[in-house]
């Protein structure tokens, strides 16, 4: 099987590429940066001409479309790039899919659940009026609508996955990255950070996420949507406390605030469907995964 992974150098894309290659697939990688490596193609998915080049002289059985601008704050500060990469990027990929007929796996986000309160099963959008709370969430929901419309009009075959708070080694720090990445980096460097006391998450270790993503290639059910999440539902303060405890630091630099506007407060995920169809397994607990992630950041950023 020949597979293309867009965003294949990213925090989720790179380990997914390794997992797919470990299974013996022929994997091509597309990303926006200049890089070297086997079967690497530079591409900004928001530019149609560059997307076309991914398919010159080669075909793929499955495209994992991960390339996107990530995160709520990033989407507010760089909204032009967010909409170009996410909305136009998916439309560009769908145009190629409509012409060439490959199957696609699309990574959406738990942010699409917006202001929904309760257990997040994949079908809640069909039963409840939901308001997405920020531009990043809106683009991901737009992407899902684009994909469903293409399937209805052209018969394209896509599986959508909604990732929940994926964390682990390999995610470089920036102020726009995920909460665990930010907490670890800022605690390591004695920098202040904010903990939102009324926010809860279902965190997923990267190895568990990519193993389930890779399983889709051989268990492909067109039109399906899956939550990929961990089994541990926790508040954000628990994450901060665990990280500080591992590092042997106090919380003097932590500001505690009740909640953050324009952000989904509670993400209680149901992952039963992914367990049933994709053999999703939550094998790494926070107690195991956080020390591994901290050790990686210490090595990368030279902190002890």
PLM regions: where:
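NAD(P)H-binding glycine-rich loop region in Rossmannoid oxidoreductase-like domains
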Residues: 45-85
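NAD(P)-dependent short-chain dehydrogenase/reductase
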Residues: 118, 145-202, 206-215, 241-244
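N-terminal Rossmann NAD(P)H-binding glycine-rich loop of SDR-like oxidoreductase domains
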Residues: 3-23
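C-terminal substrate-binding subdomain of Rossmann-fold SDR/epimerase-dehydratase oxidoreductases
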Residues: 189-304
